[in-house]
Amino acid sequence: MTTLVVFIQVQGRPGIIETKLGPATTIGELKAALAAVGVNIDVETFIYVEDAENHLHGEHHEPAYGVKHGCRIHVSRCKRIRATVHYLDKTETRDFAPGARIRAVKAHAVDVFHIPPKDAGEHVLQLCNSLERPASDTPLHTLADHNTCAVCFDLVPEKRIEG
């Protein structure tokens, strides 16, 4: 019998939890595995696999679609994360799935703001009113405000070279 190792990230809780699941995990088995590692699931908590647009839902005996070896399971109180990006004098807001990564937000901003590829490669997302620049594989729910399900970024040059 093959076991699947999955990585759990919970909104409002730092770090990553590693756990093992069976090869054909059901929604009920996944919820039981989450409870076993101290992650409480209630009616206001949603489970996402990787960067899926929709949360897992259904009966306990139904398959937990998308669960595979090495995947990330995201547990969030937000169904969507509203990401706002400021670039120069422009602002763009869009809703993303909680498991969406920073790189998806940047890609959307680059497209909307019509930034050439060379310039896009020299810019990063920085949290508004801070100097923090999250890694491109950071899930949005780990940065979002828990009450508003929102996060704000500035698209800034990675390095500023003065001549």
Curated annotation (Swiss-Prot):
Record bears the keyword Cell membrane: no
Every Ubiquitin-like BIL-type domain range: 4-80, 81-163
Biological processes, Gene Ontology terms: defense response to virus; protein modification by small protein conjugation
UniProt keyword terms in alphabetical order: Antiviral defense, Isopeptide bond, Repeat, Ubl conjugation pathway
The keyword Repeat belongs to this UniProt entry's keyword annotation: yes
Cross-link Glycyl lysine isopeptide (Gly-Lys) (interchain with K-? in central tail fiber acceptor protein) placement: 163
Function summary: Component of the Bil (bacterial ISG15-like) antiviral defense system, composed of BilA, BilB, BilC and BilD. The Bil system specifically conjugates a ubiquitin-like moiety (bilA) to the bacteriophage central tail fiber (CTF, or tip attachment protein J) via reactions involving E1 (bilD) and E2 (bilB). Modifies CTF of phage SECphi27 and SECphi4, which probably interferes with assembly of the phage tail. Also modifies T5 baseplate hub protein pb3 (gene D16), but not gp27 of phage T6 (Bil defends against T6).
Protein name listed in UniProt: Bacterial ISG15-like ubiquitin-like protein BilA
